[in-house]
Amino acid sequence: AQNPATKGEIRWNGIPVWENKEALSHICFSRELNQVSGNNMNALRIKDYLQAAEAFLPHWDKQMADSLVKQFQLEPKKRINKLSKGMLSMVTIIVALASKADFTILDEPVAGLDVIAREKFYHLLLEEYENTDRTFVVSTHIIEEAADIFEEVIIVKEGKILLKENTQDLLDRSYHVSGHADQVDAACAGLAVHHAEQIGRSKGVTVLLEEGQTI
């Protein structure tokens, strides 16, 4: 059984997904793993964990899963609760990509990965996107690094959508202003400030310009 939504409704092509096997067959939610997941799944070996995932994902590509295990240099017999943070992220990436689900959600897939591993993930994600009709939704805090690979950005805070926009359009009107706090405040007066940091007399802010505004 799934956890019911506390508010609203989730649909796939107009079909409610709650306990709906047909709708769920098109969706994969690859969540962030940890060593103490609260169930017995974290005691499984990698190969057994992936086998369990296969049982719930009808379009599973075992050949791809096996290939990704080798590419990430994971040990199939190693247990989930013995993996590092980066290795746990690799497992979630494998589940997401090998699921072959039409609509795939990845929760913080690059957490704990080094730069090389993150670049490998972005390459694999783009390759899969270009070769299929799949849609990927990726939650991440490393926005600058991932900006070039996403078509659309959605910023969510405390369950509310603050912004939903084409990536390039958003980049074209986004600016980071830094310098002496008084000068930064003067330059950004009247503008929408979305983030600000101040250390001593130095300040940096991120602003989004509306139509007709300049800085």
Model features per residue range: what roles?
Residues 22-25, 31-91:
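ABC-family P-loop ATPase nucleotide-binding domains
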Residues 6-19:
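Conserved ABC transporter NBD signature motif
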Residues 100:
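Conserved catalytic motifs of ABC-family nucleotide-binding domains
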Residues 104-108, 113:
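Catalytic Walker B motif of ABC-type/P-loop ATPase nucleotide-binding domains
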Residues 115-117:
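Helix N-cap at the start of a conserved alpha-helix in ABC-type nucleotide-binding domains
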Residues 1-3, 128:
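Residues immediately C-terminal to the Walker A/P-loop in P-loop NTPase nucleotide-binding domains
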Residues 122-137, 141-208:
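ABC transporter nucleotide-binding domain
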